[in-house]
């Protein structure tokens, strides 16, 4: 933990949260194009269903982030962590409803249980990656797991203090 804040400041973008939201919304195009490019009507329907779910929960995710932006007064990720450090507690406690909304929206946007309707085996076989195997299928899976890691890192940064633990007095 000793050098995490130095590395994070080097990688920080001045428009932090807006940058992350913009790139997470670009994933919708990949899902639709992946379903369409397979030339299968069920994969295309699965891609449309997945993109509709991603777009609809992106709104709830953005609304939960607005509360963090209003409380911190900044869009830079390091400044949000610093504000939590100055407050002496994580934003997950005063913004517990927004934290819960963010967690539910993150599960829905990454197509995890119970929001895995784009991959409903009984209706659409396996969703938008029905016709893919080997390297193309693994590319879809890597992108989905990357989306989960990004959502988890964003949750830890915005609501759980990032690298800082306010009640721990170790070498920080």
Go through the PLM ranges and name each one.
Residues 1-172:
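Selective transmembrane helix interface/packing segments
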